[in-house]
Amino acid sequence: MLAEPVVVSGMALHTPLSDELMGNLAALMAGRSAITPWRSVDTSRIYAKIGGDLGDSDLNPALAALSARLPPEMGARLQRLARRLPHMPLLGLLSVARAVLDAGLEASEAAEAHVLVAGANLSDRLMDEGFARFGATRGGIEASHELYSLDSTLAACVSELLGSRGPAFVINGACASGNLALLAGLRELRHHGAKRVIVLGAPSDVSPRGLHGFALLGALAIHRFQDEPARASRPWDRDREGFVPAHGCGVMVLEPRALCAARGARAWAELCGVGVTSDANHLTLPNEEGQARAITLALRRGGVAVEELDFVSAYATSTSAGDLVELAALRAALGPHAERLRINAPKSLLGHTLNASAVVEGVLAVLQMNADTLHGSLNIHHLDPAVDLDVCAAGPVRQPVRALLNNAFGFGGHNTTSVFRRVQ
C-alpha cells in the first residue's frame, strides 16, 4: 500500500472560454461567460436554446501543434486516432495530450499510466443521429457507429495514445463522475501498484433529446434569459431558475509525490482524499445530510482539518433548492468555520459541464489556489436572502488558500467531495 501523498503533476482544460489553463483562469477572473445560443445543436423543437458550445470548434490547429510537441511516436498515434474519432472524443484526447505535456512526461512514463475516464452517455448526439439514419434508410449507419457509441472506446483511445497497457476504464455517477474517478485514481495508486494515473473528465456530446429531457424535468434555465445567455447561470441569485449545460473537459495526472519530485516535475497540488455517499432518497432532490457526510468523509480520509480550509469550489448549479442545500451542508459539516470560507460558483461562468464538471472545476480550483486569487460568482444581482455565507458575489478576491473542497453532487443522490492541499 502506498502511504505517501499523491499529487497532481499535470492538468489540462478545454472549455468554451479557452483550451489553455491560463486562458481559462484569466477568463474567469475577467468575469467572462461561456454561455451563448447553441450553434452545433438543433434547438428548433426544444425549449433549451442556450449553452456552452464547443461542437463547432476547429480542432485542427491544436491537433497539429500538439502532435509536433509530443514524443514522435505519441504524436503519430494522435494523428492516426484523429482521423477516425468523432469530434467530442477527439476534443477529450487532445486535452489528455496537453496534460501529458504539462506533466512533462516522457513517452515511457506516459505509457505507465492507468487510464480513468469520468462519464457516461458521452455520445448522445452521435447515437441519436445514428438511430435517425437507421430508421430512415433501412439500416444506413456507419460500420463504426456502435464502437463510437461505447463510452469505453474513449478510455481505449487514451490508452492507445499513451501506449499504456495497464487498466483503462470508465466511471459513472452522473455529475459526480469526476470526483468518483479521482477516488478511483487514488485507489489505483495506493492499492493497485499504479505509478501514475490519468483522469479524464470527458466531454458530453449533448443532443436535442437530452437537453429537452432535462428541460422537462424542470432542471434547466429556459424561461427568462434565453435572449441574454450570459445572464442565465446565476447560482445563489434570487432569480435563478436552473442550470445551463455546457461542453467541456478536464484532465488531471496523479502520481506519488516522490516520483513527481524524482522527475523534477512541478506538483500543482496534493489530492488528499475524496468523500462519497449516497442518499437512498430521491432521484432529483438534493439531501443536506448526505452532502454533509461526503464533506466530512473527504476531510477525514484526506487528513485535513476543518481549520485548514480556506476555499470551496461549490457545485452550485443555479437551481432553487440545490444551491441552498449545499450551503446548509457546508454549515453542518464545517460548523462555525463555514463563515470564514470563500465559496464560489464556476458554473456561473462556464455552465454545467455535466459528467466532466468535477474534474473541470477541480482543475480550476487548483489554478485559483496557486494564483492566490478566487474568481467571483457571476450574475448575483439580487442575492437570495437565505444565503448567509461568503459566495464571492462582488467579484474576484485575493485569498491565500491552504486547502480547498471541490463539491460534485449527481442525480440519484450521488454526493462527492474532493480535498486538495497546497504543496509547500
Describe each region flagged by the PLM:
Residues 1-78, 258-272, 363-378, 416, ...:
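ACP-dependent fatty acid/polyketide chain-elongation machinery
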Residues 18-19, 126-130, 182, 208-213, ...:
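Short acidic, glycine/serine/threonine-rich loops at helix termini
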Residues 1-3, 36-94, 122-184, 217-244, ...:
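Conserved catalytic cysteine-centered active-site region
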Residues 3, 102-118, 131-143, 159-168, ...:
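Structural signature of cysteine-dependent C-C bond-forming condensing enzymes
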Residues 8-10, 28, 96, 115, ...:
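Conserved small-residue
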Residues 174, 317-319, 349-355, 408-415:
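Glycine-rich phosphate/pyrophosphate-binding beta-alpha loops
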Residues 1-22, 79-112, 342:
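N-terminal amphipathic, basic-rich helices that act as targeting or association modules
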Residues 4-11, 26-38, 47-50, 225-302, ...:
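Condensing-enzyme catalytic core mediating Claisen C-C bond formation in acyl metabolism
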